[in-house]
Every structure is written in C-alpha cells, then in structure tokens.
C-alpha cells in the first residue's frame, strides 16, 4: 500500500472532528499534515455568569511521511512533542497553560514502509511523556506516538496512544475498500484544508 493513500484516508477520518492543516511547518521543516481539535466545557447555575467550572481540552497531531522509520525519525518525533508541541502550543511560551486548561494530547503519527531495524518498534512502545501543571490544577499534557508500516501493515503505539490503535489499523481495510480519502472529500465538498499562518 502507498503511504500517500494511507495518509489520505487517515486524514479523512480525522477530518470529521479535527481541523486539518496542509502542509505544516515546524522550525523550517515541512510535514504533509497537522490536525487540531479543541473542546470547551462549562457548568453553570441558571445563568452563564454563575459559572461553576470551565475546562478546555486540546489535541495536536502531526503526520510524518517517511520511506524508512529509523532512529533519527523517532528521535525527531520525541523532540517535536517535548520541545514544540508542549512549550509552544500548550504553554504558548508561558510557565503554565491557560487557566482553564484540562489536558492536551500531543501526538506524532509516523507513516513509513518499514523500520531500518526491527528493534526500533520497541522504542516507540516505550516512549513516555507526561507533564502536569501546578499539581494538575492547570491540567496535564500527554505525549502519544504512533508508527504505521506499510510493508507488514502493522501499527505500533506507545501506551498513551494504545486506545487509538484500532482506528489506525482499520485504515488499511478502508483503503482497500476504496473509501474516499481526504482529498476526494474536500474536492466533492468544494473546501480546502486550513493553511498555517507562518
């Protein structure tokens, strides 16, 4: 299966609840796509002015398309989660996230043909990044890593991303069943992906 076909269908799944940006740059390096989701919840008594609590949740997903998943690719994914997503998108350069921040999921999805070394799959599985703010009063951030290989159609995730494994696995069958990809859906609906403001 072609990586581009897999990614196109995967973006169609994300596109139903995420804003999709194509392409997306991080520190001068261009990636095929980025997905963003935001949820705001609040509880109030009778009128909105009598607010009991508010909670904001975020998900950031970067999609990486590479022929071979090697150690450098995995290390770069870790770097993006820990040194771009968390400080720049979650905290926006501040000491803590915004007041009503509940959680942020920081995900890098690596799509490749195969690993340069089969032992690298365990590096993806073992990856862990979890950061709380003010004893979790300002919520937390969790790093999630997903690696998908075309040659053997396997999906490897770290523990934080394990619940989403079925979603990524199902894409293989959906591509074979000729389900529409993101580009086809956009064309039919006459819409285009979001553009990153640089």
Region spans (language model):
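Short, flexible beta-strand-to-coil junctions
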Residues: 56-58, 62-69, 111-115, 140, ...
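Intrinsic-disorder-associated interaction segments
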Residues: 3-7, 70, 74, 157-164
């Amino acid at each position: 299966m072609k990586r581009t076909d897999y990614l196109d269908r995967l973006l169609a799944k994300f596109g139903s609840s995420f804003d999709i940006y194509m392409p997306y740059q991080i520190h001068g390096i261009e990636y095929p796509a980025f997905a963003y989701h935001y949820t705001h919840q609040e509880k109030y008594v009778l009128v909105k002015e009598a607010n009991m609590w508010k909670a904001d949740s975020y998900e950031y997903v970067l999609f990486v398309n590479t022929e071979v998943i090697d150690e450098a690719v995995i290390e770069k994914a870790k770097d993006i989660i820990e040194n771009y997503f968390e400080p720049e998108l979650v905290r926006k350069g501040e000491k803590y996230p915004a007041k009503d921040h509940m959680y942020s999921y920081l995900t890098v999805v690596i799509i490749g043909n195969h690993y340069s070394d089969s032992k690298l799959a365990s590096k993806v599985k073992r990856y862990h990044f979890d950061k709380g703010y003010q004893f979790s009063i300002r919520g937390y951030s969790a790093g999630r890593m997903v690696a998908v290989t075309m040659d053997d159609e396997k999906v490897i995730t770290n523990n934080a991303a394990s619940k989403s494994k079925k979603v990524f696995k199902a894409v293989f069958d959906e591509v074979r069943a000729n389900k529409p990809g993101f580009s086809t859906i956009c064309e039919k609906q006459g819409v285009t992906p979001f553009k990153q403001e640089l």
